[in-house]
């Protein structure tokens, strides 16, 4: 009888060890990728799915001028097209790039983003700014290469900023770090007033 209980106990220990190993290897739940900043703050990127959607807005567009970009972003390397409400001609936001990072800036309450994030986020805080961040890995292309996309959303003043950086999966650390650098530059740049941009 004692031998039976020893066998049951050994089996239970094996199950616990296997279970702990499975949970530690992230086979269950989401996989988080954490960027630790110089000051000790962290940004947690949660693995999610992304999908495209269409935006149904009546807008007019034009490129931001060099003077407008300098007013909003000082010396950051930005190119962007501004979106204006076609009826009242007020600016809604803009879409463009800061270096190689895609950026969409929307006035709060306006959605200019054609990307749907399917999953959970963990809110991180950097210099008092709350950031929801994540990443997505595509299926392999015909050459067997996967693309990784890191993204983040945060509010600055009266605007919501979405940034996204992509690259091949085996360079995901570089992709993540490039996006983090952009986030930090935008936070350092501070909030800006889109109402100064006229159609």
Which residues fall in each region the model found?
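Intrinsically disordered, low-complexity segments of exported/surface proteins
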Residues: 26-27, 120, 156
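Short, solvent-exposed recognition patches
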Residues: 47-148
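Surface-exposed amphipathic alpha-helical segments
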Residues: 165-199
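Short, aromatic- and cysteine-enriched interfacial helices/patches
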Residues: 25-29, 73, 78, 192
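Membrane-interface helical sensory segment of bacterial ECF anti-sigma factor regulators
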Residues: 1-54
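Hydrophobic alpha-helical bundles in membrane proteins
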Residues: 29, 33-35, 112-113, 117, ...
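Short, well-structured beta-strand
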Residues: 144-178
